[in-house]
């Protein structure tokens, strides 16, 4: 483990420690999540998902950043993806139980608000199935397209305002995936 790794771990500990040490700060965090879920999703995904990408880069290349990677553009994109994820979680957590009830599985919506029961487990399974078969493929495709666009723009913040050449990127990804098979 290198000094940079220890510094990264130290920064994470310093960032998270106050939430474990102060009940008031943690309560304020929970209240903020409840009253501003989409703003908090933007911030949390912008920070945590970008940290995950930086860790992935460290594992792959041995560095936390490199020319063309674009930490800031990744953070902005992840922030907006986080808002989209939060909106989909809200939509699916209400919509899927309603659809399940329209198919005759009575009580799913109420079960989702209570303690763990077999019906709540079924509801959670249906929500997960719906999310993973409808939202996830579109999400992962868009995520790959935005990553490619950031890379194609040299990791610059200009990637955030330049039009994304969707067709070209999709064709590039499709042909490179076909070549891997």
Identify the residue ranges that each predicted region occupies:
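N-terminal membrane topogenic signal
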Residues: 1-11
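Alpha-helical transmembrane segments of multi-pass membrane proteins
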Residues: 12-26
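Loop-to-helix transition at the N-terminal end of transmembrane alpha-helices
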Residues: 32-50
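Alpha-helical transmembrane segments
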Residues: 37-43, 123-135
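Hydrophobic/aromatic-rich structural module bridging two neighboring secondary-structure elements via a short loop
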Residues: 61-90
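Transmembrane alpha-helix/helix-exit interface in multi-pass inner-membrane proteins
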Residues: 82-103, 128-153
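Membrane-interface interhelical connector segments
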Residues: 95-121, 153-161
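Conserved small/polar residues in nucleotide/adenosyl-binding loops
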Residues: 174-181
């Amino acid at each position: 483990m290198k000094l940079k790794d220890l510094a990264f771990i130290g920064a994470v500990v310093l960032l998270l420690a106050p939430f474990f040490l102060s009940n008031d700060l943690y309560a304020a965090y929970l209240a903020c999540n409840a009253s501003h879920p989409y703003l908090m999703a933007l911030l949390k995904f912008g920070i945590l998902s970008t940290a995950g990408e930086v860790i992935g880069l460290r594992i792959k290349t041995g560095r936390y950043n490199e020319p063309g990677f674009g930490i800031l553009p990744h953070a902005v994109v992840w922030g907006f993806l986080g808002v989209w994820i939060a909106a989909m979680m809200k939509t699916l957590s209400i919509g899927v139980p309603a659809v399940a009830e329209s198919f005759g599985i009575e009580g799913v919506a109420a079960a989702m608000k209570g303690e763990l029961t077999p019906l709540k487990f079924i509801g959670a399974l249906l929500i997960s199935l719906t999310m993973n078969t409808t939202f996830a493929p579109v999400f992962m495709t868009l995520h790959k397209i935005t990553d490619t666009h950031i890379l194609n723009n040299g990791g610059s913040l200009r990637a955030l305002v330049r039009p994304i050449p969707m067709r070209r990127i999709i064709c590039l990804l499709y042909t490179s995936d076909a070549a891997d098979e």
